[in-house]
Amino acid sequence: MRELFLTLLAGVAVATLSAQTPPQKPPDDAEKVLRAAVAAAPSMALSPVPITVPGVTMGMVSWVSSAADGTAYLLQRGDQADPVIAVDRNGQVLRSWGNGLYVMPHAIRVDPQGNVWTTDAASSHVIKFSPEGRVLLDIVVGGQPTPCRNNFCSTTDIAFAANGHFFIADGYANARILEYTADGTKLREWGAPGTGPGQFVLPHSIQIDPAGIVYVADRENGRVQRFDQTGKFLGEWIYGKTFGLEADGAFMWLSTQPLQQPNLSPGWLLKVDTKTGKIAGKVPSAGNHGMDVMASGELLLGPGPNLVPQWYRRPR
């Protein structure tokens, strides 16, 4: 996994809970504890810069991802441009695709082979594309209720295991994680609604670290849960309303905010040590959803203020 080279501006990281803490409902003072832990954590020298795409009118950029060559992939919800837009570092469009394929585009991820995957929060489709936009695999997860309220009733995110399997978070209306083989054959699913271990209230993002541990952003429970790949509960972190996760070697990045605040409120990008569960670094953010760590060691966040995606770049 890519290693993030950033400058730390302060000292020792502080966390609210270790990675092995037993599951529990976030306490009434969870926001106070979270803010104290974040305040004590070291800041990181990254500055947000809006991503502008000349000549393209985008809607909300729900999620962002990047390839090893630095290409950034934006997944946007407007009707005046293709849903998937690939841009270079200067925001110039390299290619785009996806018109007519989506109801509510939600997450976009680039797998280790450079293929581009997307989820749809309304239709339950999970689509795998070549880097040029050719459909390679189209899975209908199913199980969404009818009618679909506000177009949010299905898949949220996707993660890739070292053996080629992939895991889908099905969070809107459902509370489950599904595992598929590389060819799209469903192997198993696990999870249920609730606040206990292995239960979810909107599993919004999913990632797998180099050790094979599965991390699920249990958004409305205000925590990140950890599992093995069969769904066995390993522990949790109580770090607020986490929208996005991004694995980065020995660290996991969280795009998060206080649990009781409205969605897309100001919060933080937190760099958490996966072995200790402690915050190793922080970057303030004006709004949170999907995020990505680029091969360059810089961050992408979608959306930021005014629903515009942002680069988080090192000062020059």
Label every PLM stretch briefly:
Residues V87-Q92, S130-R134, T181-T185, D228-K232, ...:
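Short loop/turn segments that connect beta-strands within beta-propeller blades
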Residues A41-G59, G91-M104, L136-S154, T185-L202, ...:
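Gly/Pro-rich loop segments of beta-rich domains
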Residues L74-G78, V116-A121, I168-G171, V214-R219, ...:
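Conserved beta-strand positions in repeat-built beta-propeller and related beta-rich domains
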